């Protein structure tokens, strides 16, 4: 029945409008995170600190010292922090440029009242590009074929589309023209010669967070942009050159060029030692109940943990479906009342168990910190990354997309 209703609705749209409905990604929330009810009855939630975010923006702007413009990268729903929550701070701090990946992100950025520069930082499909014309978004272009197709779309709508020509200067081999070959340079020249595309920027992206590798990619980018500007007879004063992500922005100042694209640094996700940037996200849950079990009992699926003593185990209302992955089985820790307690047994779909035997004050209803700080304790980025075997962004983008979010200050 649901399928038949959907089919009927689609048929009605086609009958009434003469057009097939455009299906897109699930709508992102415009919630600004100020309603406590969004997390009060939730099993797990993400807290986002507006003060930390605004502090990080100001710190970054001060470091740039007006020599490079800041483009705030808010892809993946602002790295899981929620574009609806983040945009008021972006606007309040006067950030001139926002970068996104999806049309839905672009919609929320514009709906928030942002009228500045909006850029997509990945290759779009042709249907995405056409739909995004309504958001006045600048598009990444990295092939002559795509440029011709984009030009045709812009012409059909009577528009001129602003584009950023991407180079494969550091070997990402993902979006950019390969300027190390003559055929690639020929493609770049063709891209600059499309009637309905306005070239406003030249860009690249660094493949490795390593200073020497960044400098090597930067040298290639500088040579390649110089060549294209000369041979395509471009006006350098009308072009924005940008390459630096958060790592390059903070660690290789010469890579900042005209504009930097920072995402992680805005949210406090930086290299070790950059303590001036504050973490903007915490991931939390609650204790459902505390149970007593005798020594010798096993815990969880597949009996991966055996109690060595009579124990008190707290049942936490979060699991791998909420983004707390099974990799933390018998390895992770959480904070309850400031106590650091270990995860025991396999993380389940909706539940995990922790050993609170040594802490009689732990009881049902207590707040649990899965990532972040509590009463002097901390679950750190380093330990989460070591156990997960990947960057923290691999986790917090999922936490944010799987759980409600709230601003805490």
UniProtKB/Swiss-Prot annotation:
UniProt keyword Transmembrane helix present: no
pH dependence: Optimum pH is 9.0.
Gene: bar
Reaction catalysed by this enzyme: an L-alpha-amino acid = a D-alpha-amino acid; L-lysine = D-lysine; L-arginine = D-arginine; L-alanine = D-alanine
GO cellular component, one term: periplasmic space
Keywords: Disulfide bond, Isomerase, Periplasm, Pyridoxal phosphate, Signal
Protein name: Broad specificity amino-acid racemase
Primary residence: periplasm
Keyword Signal in annotation: yes
InterPro entries xrefs: Ala_racemase, Ala_racemase/Decarboxylase_C, Ala_racemase_C, Ala_racemase_N, Ala_racemase_pyridoxalP-BS, PLP-binding_barrel, Racemase_Bsr/Lyr
Substitution effect: residue 174 to A/K: Loss of catalytic activity
Record family assignment: Belongs to the alanine racemase family. Bsr subfamily.
Cofactor field: pyridoxal 5'-phosphate
Regulation: Activity is enhanced by Co(2+), Mn(2+) and Sr(2+), and decreased by Cu(2+).
GO molecular function: alanine racemase activity; arginine racemase activity; lysine racemase activity; pyridoxal phosphate binding
Assigned EC number: 5.1.1.10
Organism superkingdom: Bacteria
Pfam families to which the protein is assigned, alphabetical: Ala_racemase_C, Ala_racemase_N
Localisation per UniProt entry: Periplasm
Phenotypic consequence of residue 175 to L: Loss of catalytic activity
Temperature and thermostability: Optimum temperature is 37 degrees Celsius.
PROSITE patterns hit by this protein: ALANINE_RACEMASE (PS00395)
């Amino acid at each position: 029945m649901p399928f038949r209703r959907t089919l009927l609705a689609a048929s009605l749209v086609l009958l009434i409008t003469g057009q097939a409905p455009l299906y897109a990604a699930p709508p992102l929330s415009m919630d600004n995170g100020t309603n406590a009810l969004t997390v009060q009855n939730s099993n797990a939630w993400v807290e986002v600190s507006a003060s930390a975010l605004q502090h990080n923006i100001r710190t970054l702007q001060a470091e740039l010292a007006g020599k490079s413009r800041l483009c705030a990268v808010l892809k993946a729903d602002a790295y899981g922090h929620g574009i609806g929550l983040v945009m008021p701070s972006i606007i309040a701090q006067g950030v001139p440029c926002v970068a996104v990946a999806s049309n839905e992100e672009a919609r929320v950025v514009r709906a928030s009242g942002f009228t500045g520069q909006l850029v997509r930082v990945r290759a779009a499909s042709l249907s995405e590009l056409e739909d995004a014309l309504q958001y006045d978004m600048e598009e990444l272009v990295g092939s002559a074929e795509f440029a011709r197709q984009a030009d045709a779309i812009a012409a059909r709508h009577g528009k001129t589309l602003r584009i950023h020509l991407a180079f494969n200067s550091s070997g990402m081999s993902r979006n950019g023209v390969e300027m190390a070959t003559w055929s690639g340079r020929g493609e770049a020249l063709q891209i600059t010669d499309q009637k309905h595309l306005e070239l406003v920027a030249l860009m690249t992206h660094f493949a490795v967070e390593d200073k020497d590798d960044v400098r090597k990619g930067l040298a290639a980018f500088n040579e390649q942009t110089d060549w294209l500007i000369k041979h395509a007879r471009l006006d350098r004063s009308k072009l924005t050159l940008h390459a630096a992500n958060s790592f390059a922005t903070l660690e290789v100042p010469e890579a900042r060029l005209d504009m930097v694209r920072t995402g992680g640094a805005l949210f406090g996700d930086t290299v070790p030692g950059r303590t001036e940037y504050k973490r903007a996200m915490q991931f939390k849950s609650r204790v459902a109940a505390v149970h007593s079990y005798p020594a010798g009992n096993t815990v969880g699926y597949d009996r991966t943990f055996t109690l060595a003593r009579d124990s008190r185990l707290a049942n936490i209302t979060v699991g791998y479906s909420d983004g707390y992955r099974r990799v933390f089985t018998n390895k992770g820790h959480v904070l309850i009342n400031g106590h650091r307690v270990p995860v025991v047994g396999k993380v389940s779909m909706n539940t995990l168990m922790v050993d609170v035997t040594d802490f009689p004050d732990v009881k049902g209803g207590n707040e649990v910190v899965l990532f972040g700080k509590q009463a002097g304790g901390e679950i750190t980025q380093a330990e989460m990354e070591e156990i997960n075997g990947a960057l923290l962004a691999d986790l917090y983008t999922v936490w944010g997309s799987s759980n409600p979010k709230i601003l805490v200050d």
